[in-house]
Amino acid sequence: MAIDESKLNEFLGKAVGDLGAAMSAALMLVGDRLGLYKELAKGPITSSDLAQKTGTNERYVREWLGNQGAGGYVQFDATKNNWSLSPEQALCLADPNGPVDMPGAYNIVEATFHALDRTLDNFRTGKGMEWGEHHPCLFHGTERFFRAGYNANLITSWLPALDGVVEKLKAGAKVADVGCGHGASAVLMAKTYPNSKVTGYDYHADSIRTARERAAAAGVTNVQFEEADAVSYRGESFDLIAFFDCLHDMGDPVGVSRHARRALKDDGTVMIVEPFANDNVQDNLNPVGRVMYGASSQICVPVSLARNGPALGAQAGERRLREVVVTGGGFGRFRRATETPFNLVLEARP
């Protein structure tokens, strides 16, 4: 087969860019954990001053800055020999309470390397890997990365996109957050709507313990957390049942949907927040799809297969989710309420 040299060079250029990104992943964690990004966000600084202020070694910091500058993650002023973050870079790299927490996502990347041997075995055998078997950096990373998205969207756009839900929350609603993890979404809803009662459920005991700590630290008293499976949690007559970035991970998403239908009031709402995906594979072959397929093959699919589930994956798409919730779960109404580049927000009603 003849080789097209121009196409070869084009592919190699892409591969080198990806290799550079991969080599930089651990350095993202370095910048985050050692406070380098936060210090850079304060204004232009030399490598020596950055090292001094962060208690790090200048030679390592200088090399780190070179990597970050080459990747377009920091700015370099050659005339003054100093480094800085643009406002946009600072928002994404140095503001954990902002709308994007990119370093948090790299904790998820870190977890995939901790699980590499298991992933190799899963590919060979078709076995799965329970959520709780992952390194704790996965739980920390998903909390950080998803919390930023919830802070940016949940109160201002996602909940208002649901029919009549905000009014119920303001008056006082009974809410279930199923698969709540560390409780970021549950605490945010409880804090915003003090008349409502929010219960977070998760089958991962360590996550429930952390969620309780987060609620206590936030001083929120109208939220509680219970260790429970998504097909057997207690409670009924909920006004709102929410699934944030988790339904596709479930071992029995149809059973989960049926249980939600039983636990919901007749005029209640189920909100399903899922990774953004189109229904056809070819329409997901883009940068966001690449991230999602990567996470799905190493985290989401194994979690479902560990429980003999259908392995919907993080690119399930609206059509497949409709089959699960409506055909399987018994809901009568289902629609896309809103979306972001990273999420689908789906609404189901009896």
Feature map (PLM): residue ranges:
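Conserved Class I S-adenosyl-L-methionine-dependent methyltransferase catalytic core
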Residues: 2, 6, 14-33, 38-39, ...
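A short acidic, leucine-rich amphipathic alpha-helix
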Residues: 49-53
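Conserved adenosyl
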Residues: 113-248, 253-255
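Short glycine-centered segments of the SAM/dcSAM-binding site in methyltransferase folds
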Residues: 174, 268-269
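A short glycine-rich, Lys/Arg-flanked "PGG" loop and its adjoining helix->strand segment in the class I
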Residues: 254-266
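Core SAM-dependent methyltransferase catalytic element
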Residues: 329-350
